[in-house]
């Protein structure tokens, strides 16, 4: 439906998204993020698998909490479809909508934390080989943890609005 609306706006001069013709540009933003946001969460899943393989192999241990890691990856993929509007806190969403997207976004921190702590537990007490792939994986863990912590802050719609258009968001 969204692509049809966009194509008719561009080719047949309809005004689904043009406010001058009674359209709603916020609707376009919802449609954009509804597609674009889950994509990001799905695209990171193979990267998680690569990090798990590197950490496990170069620590000489099995992945800690393997079943929990699988469930965490599935829940991240599913929850990614439910949080698109956390990129839209400044467009005038009502309080109840912002509260839902705040809570749903914060919930993603749980499976993400499971993954981080499982990777750390996999390395703990292992025979770690400090070669380039492992150093990359450890750097990823550090940056992903910082991104996750700043993401929890930005999940709060009130703080997100205050921090909008700042380097804090860029750093996240």
Curated annotation (Swiss-Prot):
Its main location: mitochondrion. It comes from the Eukaryota. It catalyses: 4 Fe(II)-[cytochrome c] + O2 + 8 H(+)(in) = 4 Fe(III)-[cytochrome c] + 2 H2O + 4 H(+)(out). It is found in: Mitochondrion inner membrane. Its EC number is 7.1.1.9. Heme a3 binds at residue 172. One of its GO terms (biological process) is mitochondrial electron transport, cytochrome c to oxygen. GO terms for molecular function: cytochrome-c oxidase activity; heme binding; metal ion binding. Mg(2+) binds at residues 164-165. O2 binds at residue 41. Binds 2 heme A groups non-covalently per subunit. Binds a copper B center. PROSITE patterns: COX1, COX1_CUB. It is a multi-pass membrane protein. There is a cross-link at residues 37-41 (1'-histidyl-3'-tyrosine (His-Tyr)). The chain crosses the membrane at residues 31-51, 63-83, 106-126, 134-154. Keywords: Copper, Electron transport, Heme, Iron, Magnesium, Membrane, Metal-binding, Mitochondrion, Mitochondrion inner membrane, Respiratory chain, Translocase, Transmembrane, Transmembrane helix, Transport. One of its GO terms (cellular component) is mitochondrial inner membrane. Cu cation binds at residues 37, 86-87. Pathway: Energy metabolism; oxidative phosphorylation. The keyword Thylakoid does not apply. InterPro entries: Cyt_c_oxase-like_su1_dom, Cyt_c_oxase-like_su1_sf, Cyt_C_Oxase_1, Cyt_c_Oxase_su1_BS. Component of the cytochrome c oxidase, the last enzyme in the mitochondrial electron transport chain which drives oxidative phosphorylation. The respiratory chain contains 3 multisubunit complexes succinate dehydrogenase (complex II, CII), ubiquinol-cytochrome c oxidoreductase (cytochrome b-c1 complex, complex III, CIII) and cytochrome c oxidase (complex IV, CIV), that cooperate to transfer electrons derived from NADH and succinate to molecular oxygen, creating an electrochemical gradient over the inner membrane that drives transmembrane transport and the ATP synthase. Component of the cytochrome c oxidase (complex IV, CIV), a multisubunit enzyme composed of a catalytic core of 3 subunits and several supernumerary subunits. The complex exists as a monomer or a dimer and forms supercomplexes (SCs) in the inner mitochondrial membrane with ubiquinol-cytochrome c oxidoreductase (cytochrome b-c1 complex, complex III, CIII). This is Cytochrome c oxidase subunit 1. It comes from Ephedra major. The gene is COX1.
């Amino acid at each position: 439906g969204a692509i049809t609306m966009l194509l008719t706006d561009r080719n047949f001069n309809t005004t689904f998204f043009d406010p001058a013709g009674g359209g709603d540009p916020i609707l376009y933003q919802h449609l954009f993020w509804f597609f674009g946001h889950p994509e990001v969460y799905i695209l990171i899943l193979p990267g998680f698998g690569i990090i798990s393989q590197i950490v496990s192999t170069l620590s000489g241990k099995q992945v800690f909490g393997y079943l929990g890691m699988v469930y965490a990856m599935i829940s991240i993929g599913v929850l990614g479809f439910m949080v698109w509007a956390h990129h839209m806190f400044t467009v005038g969403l009502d309080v109840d909508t912002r509260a839902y997207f705040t809570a749903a976004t914060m919930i993603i921190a749980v499976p993400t934390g499971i993954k981080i702590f499982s990777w750390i537990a996999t390395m703990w007490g292992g025979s770690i080989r400090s070669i380039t792939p492992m150093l990359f994986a450890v750097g990823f863990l550090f940056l992903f943890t910082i991104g996750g912590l700043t993401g929890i802050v930005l999940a709060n719609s009130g703080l997100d609005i205050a921090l909008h258009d700042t380097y804090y968001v860029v750093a996240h």
